[in-house]
Amino acid sequence: MTKYIFVTGGVVSSLGKGITAASLGRLLKNRGLNVTIQKFDPYINVDPGTMSPYQHGEVFVTDDGAETDLDLGHYERFIDINLNKYSNVTTGKIYSSVLQKERRGEYLGGTVQVIPHITNEIKERVYRSGRETNADVVITEIGGTVGDIESLPFLEAIRQIKSDIGRDNVMYIHCTLIPYLKAAGEMKTKPTQHSVKELRSLGIQPNIIVVRTELPVSQDMKDKLALFCDIDTKAVIEARDADTLYAVPLSLQEQNMDQIVCDHLKLDNPAADMTDWTALVNKVRNLSKKTKIALVGKYVELQDAYISVVEALRHAGYSFDTDVEVKWVNAEHVTAENVKELVGDTDGILVPGGFGDRGVEGKIVAIQYARENKVPFLGICLGMQLASIEFARNVLGLEGANSSEINPDTPYAIIDLLPEQKDVEDLGGTLRLGLYPCKLAEETNAYNAYNEPVVYERHRHRYEFNNQFRPDMEKAGFVFSGTSPDGRLVEIIELQDHPWFVAAQFHPELVSRPNRPQPLFHDFVSASITNKESK
């Protein structure tokens, strides 16, 4: 029978529930269990696709095209699995589904209420995740903080699940904070006690408490928490700030967290073999070289907006025993006069994805600098589109060339709407989303990176390269190294007389793993290291 683990949070948000859930998933997978994982977000948006990155951070796209929470990126990178649309559930999705059922008459004239209809829909999403993946264990992270009004239906639903399928098949893990009061010189357990009290008042008794802390938690403090929260002392798990996220699974294993979980759920799988993971962490902690990459974006104040990009750069660096330092460059501040000052000390330049016109001209200036000064360049999504526009303006001399997204009246729409997008009015969930094939041209940097004729990558865009400009740009040295299999859509572009200048319409960062870097990132970092060594 499938086992279910629920991870909740208390006291404050951003405690690392997602990393805790992902780390536990890795430990259980290494015990030979088939693990899947999901995130429940209590906001009323159907998905984060139209939310500002300042509000939500990065939008992570799954193979099947779901726009999801950035925690799914952590899940995939840690557990090394590909998740799907069932892995992220929001209040908006739940209510939308229930209202559609009501309109179809599925409730037989009954009064539709939070209990049982909303809670039943939530439970169905939990069970479906296990069914669709044939999982031994389903880990579900509940977003928000215990005590929030928005979270109540989710907490009630997961309370009911224990009654539905039995205590041996359900486990609750609660993540809290033990703050250190500098003035008093002591750590305080009271916020954790009150958070657990709130959770218990809702009918949920946590089996494990994971306490986030800056300093070591004494045995006396663990005993106190165990007494007041009614759990075993060994089930108080310390989550200290780590020098690398990838060390967290090893810290949890040292405290026997995965064994406690298996004992409670009556799973007799052998201990997790973390030899390879330990080797990875040791490598990360002992990188001997450095390279600096400029990330030119418009959300640089909130680095979570580009979290998968940064992780993909780091993964690539691990292959070369290199610590990749990211220099955050606000695209709105970049001009032709100061671009050298802002990016001249870096070994490579990356322009990530985005929407809208803010910061676009600054990104184009940075791309021009990379092209003219032979600096390794990687463009992603909008970065690929702007690389095309920069070439059209400054090499072909098409003054005013632009994207019809940025300037609908441009005389040269190098980037235009996909034909199937012309009549689309809704913004949410209507992009070209998910995994699509890309055919690679031989004897190109793209082909050399993948060493395969056809690859599959995840997309999230509405605009595409305008094919009427293809012949002129090819004549001028612009290489279309990746297209859709029918040749209609441009997927990857690069330059002929440049050491390494590649840009992709898709989002390669989404499939990178710490032990398996994404090929374009791998070769981009390699080219950046070579550039540094040649200076």
From Swiss-Prot:
Catalytic residues in the record: C381 (nucleophile), H507, E509
Q: Which EC number applies?
A: 6.3.4.2
GO BP of this protein: 'de novo' CTP biosynthetic process; pyrimidine nucleobase biosynthetic process
**What does this chain do?**
Catalyzes the ATP-dependent amination of UTP to CTP with either L-glutamine or ammonia as the source of nitrogen. Regulates intracellular CTP levels through interactions with the four ribonucleotide triphosphates.
Q: Which PANTHER family match?
A: CTP SYNTHASE, CTP SYNTHASE-RELATED
The UniProt similarity line reads:
Belongs to the CTP synthase family.
Name under which the protein is recorded? CTP synthase
Question: What species is this protein from?
Answer: Bacillus mycoides (strain KBAB4)
